[in-house]
Amino acid sequence: MSILNLVRADLLNSKNYVPGGESARYRSHANELPWSPVTMGEHNLNYYPNIGLQIELQKQLAKRYQIYSDQIILTRGSDDGIDLTTRLFLTAGKDAFMQFPPTFPMYAFYVRLQQAELIECPLDRRTNFRLTLDQIENSWKPNCKIIMFCSPNNPTGNLVDLNLIAKTCELYANQSIIVVDEAYIEFANAPSATSLIGEFENLIVLRTLSKAFGLAGLRLGCIIAQSPIIQAFNKIIAPYSIATPSMELAKRALNNSDWFTKTIEQIKSSRAWVIKKFADNPIIEKIYPTETNFILIQTRFSKQLTTWLAHYGIAVRDFPSSSLLHDHLRITVGHDEQNQLLINTLSSFNADVAGLNYEKDFIY
């Protein structure tokens, strides 16, 4: 069975959009203006993005991720990769998508847009949200077209074991696409699932430049998979979807490996410092192990703390509507000044006033 049989049947015979006129002296085919009010180096922004620039960036990323250049396609951040994946494989009213909550809420968002079934296999906080193969097998159904791992998981911070990913790929080789969202993998002391790409044709890995690379404003990411799957994605991706300035700035940033290495080490060091300070705070009941640039904590004062911190200009992520995380907060590790302000503000929170109705009684 070809892995392409998992692609939506109505898309299999569709044709890729192929831009033309890339090397033409006069671009009289694309209805562009001959002038631009701004320029960016050698790039004329009055023209649609050049495919050559995209190929260069894909090769640069392929080298970094240790894959072949035909195993990668650029996306507008990880969200775009999730959207494209659900659109390529899920048939409305027929196929299902499995996720492991608590996890990134955009998975369910795009599944709903595709009008597909959502299979939820909840993680248990008593085991620090560890996932097992038995859980997957007990939740899987024959119409499950996509199994989505987030590793490290957002918002819990833990990794999915690489052996578990490999076993899942093998177990559902001709039945499901296995997707691994690795938005935070650079912060982890663990190998990437990209190391499995050559072994499993039903594996897709999503990466982004928004987190560890510090380029969230560029909206750039990529889909990594074996070449036939990448070619299938080309059938549905929008033409000229990646902006010229985003690609050019990303290329420049990726050349600065020293900055990247230093920044990752700084975040890891700061993360350890913040965790130590959290451990000294009596209102924080649990600190979950993390392989990311954020920390998940449990506190019965989650609602009050969110309001208290907001009063001092600090935004944190709470989960008031979650049955699993209603008494938890996710807090991002920042630079030294941000981290110190966070710790000082948490320390100033007095458990004696936690019973106030902050929406009513707190004076701003």
UniProtKB/Swiss-Prot annotation:
PROSITE patterns listed in its UniProt record: AA_TRANSFER_CLASS_2
Transferase in keyword set: yes
GO MF term (any one): histidinol-phosphate transaminase activity
Coiled-coil regions listed in the entry: none
Transmembrane region(s): none
Reactions catalysed, as given in the entry: L-histidinol phosphate + 2-oxoglutarate = 3-(imidazol-4-yl)-2-oxopropyl phosphate + L-glutamate
Pathway(s) the chain acts in: Amino-acid biosynthesis; L-histidine biosynthesis; L-histidine from 5-phospho-alpha-D-ribose 1-diphosphate: step 7/9
Co-factor requirement: pyridoxal 5'-phosphate
Gene Ontology annotations of biological process type: L-histidine biosynthetic process
Its EC number(s): 2.6.1.9
Superkingdom in the source lineage: Bacteria
Keywords (A to Z) from UniProt: Amino-acid biosynthesis, Aminotransferase, Histidine biosynthesis, Pyridoxal phosphate, Transferase
Residue numbers carrying N6-(pyridoxal phosphate)lysine: 211
Keyword Protease carried by entry: no
PANTHER family listed in its UniProt record: HISTIDINOL-PHOSPHATE AMINOTRANSFERASE (PTHR42885:SF2), HISTIDINOL-PHOSPHATE AMINOTRANSFERASE-RELATED (PTHR42885)
Family: Belongs to the class-II pyridoxal-phosphate-dependent aminotransferase family. Histidinol-phosphate aminotransferase subfamily.
Subunit structure: Homodimer.
Protein known as: Histidinol-phosphate aminotransferase 1
Organism annotation: Legionella pneumophila subsp. pneumophila (strain Philadelphia 1 / ATCC 33152 / DSM 7513)
Taxonomic lineage of the native organism: Bacteria, Pseudomonadati, Pseudomonadota, Gammaproteobacteria, Legionellales
Underlying gene: hisC1
